[in-house]
Regions:
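Basic, amphipathic N-terminal segments that precede the first structured/catalytic domain
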Residues: 2-22
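Proline/glycine-enriched tight loop/beta-turn segments at coil->beta junctions
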Residues: 31-34
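Short His-Asn-centered micro-motif
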Residues: 41, 79-81, 189
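Second-shell loop/turn segments in exported
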Residues: 48-57, 160-165
């Protein structure tokens, strides 16, 4: 059925095992688009690290194309620009996140702030380690690290925020949105 196929996401998952990290494991899956959310995390308009800012600029256009394609298939889009959601306080996307009915999460959500922001530390009881070392707050410049400064004010404009999308940097609000829509699968970008 052509219409049913259009609402499916045919994906290849790639992972590595702790025992053999050099070996890539691939698995083909099919997800229902309507039971899938795509979360865009920390694609800010600027970064105090020059290399991070450059990477966001390079990724934003292709990421927006992926977001548009996912949205067209029926994937729910959540924008999650940590620590700058107040920029969006009066938007319908922010209202959608704030108004989602409360839903208790199956495990406690992390509430331990990281670097004085809403960005929470991963909880090793439930999550693996990040694939990068972010102990320096995200600078990957060679040699001398960039000076930390207040840099981001919003999500980069290249990634479109449209009607039906949500915007939050709060774990409980995110869980509420996912539960309300009976989302089974999440793609984190």
């Amino acid at each position: 059925n052509m219409m049913a196929d259009e609402k499916k996401l045919n994906l290849t998952l790639r992972s590595r095992t702790k025992g053999a990290p050099e070996k890539v494991v691939e698995k083909k899956i099919n997800w229902e688009a309507g039971k899938t959310a795509l979360i865009i995390c920390d694609m800010w308009d600027d970064h105090w690290c020059k290399s991070a800012s450059r990477r966001v600029g390079e990724l934003a256009g292709p990421m927006n194309a992926v977001v548009e394609a996912a949205r067209e298939k029926g994937v729910f889009i959540i924008h999650a620009p940590s620590s700058v959601v107040s920029f969006y306080d009066k938007t319908p996307q922010r209202k959608l996140a704030k108004d989602a009915p409360f839903s208790k999460s199956p495990i406690p959500l992390s509430v331990k702030e990281r670097w004085g922001t809403n960005w929470c530390w991963p909880d090793p009881k439930y999550e693996g380690v990040l694939p990068i070392d972010d102990s320096d707050m995200g600078c990957s410049c060679k040699g001398e690290k960039c000076e930390i400064r207040e840099a981001w004010t919003r999500q980069i404009k290249t990634i479109e925020l449209v009607k039906g999308d949500a915007l939050t940097d709060n774990g409980q609000e995110t869980w509420n949105l996912l539960a309300e829509r009976k989302i089974d699968n999440v793609i984190l970008c």
